[in-house]
Amino acid sequence: VHDDLPSNLCYDWEIGVKDEVDAIFDKADHVTKLDLINNRLVANPIEPRAALAEYDPAGDHYTLHTTSQNPHVIRLLMGAFVLSIPEHKLRVVAPDVGGGFGTKIYHYAEEAILTWASKKVRRPIKWTADRSDSFMTDAQGRDHVTTGELALDKDGHFLGLRVMTNANMGGYLSTFAPAIPTYLYATLLAGLYKTP
């Protein structure tokens, strides 16, 4: 995608102390290994994304009603990076969001364009995605290829996890894309099991 870069590796991220984990695995009574492929997916909520933006010239204030799962971050990003206004000049309301499956947590161009345009035309502007819009523009779950290893003692207690994941980030990063296969993923791998 980017000809000026030497490879398509976006970043290499680690959590934990590799030498300590390797030592735990060397002493483990049992090590089990799993290769896992998580396919790319498209969330498909019944309720598509939608937004209504309105500018109030009297108070120099915007209101955005949007089907966002994360209205506070939308307000932060739009205030700081899109409209260049203080956060208190933008109210973001997320009423009945409907289904989302994570795809409505991102900041989308439609929200920014509607909000900006509402000031230009001095009228409220609304938009609702149709199914084709959703398939083409909603953030998708990127595929991951993972090798996971679990070190156990003789009684089956977890001693440690060692995981290597290659995550397809796509050509361009979305709002939360870097966090999903790294911090959000790695810190949840053990689930509810006691793992040192």
Give residue spans per PLM region.
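Structural alpha/beta core scaffold segments of enzyme domains
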Residues: 1-196
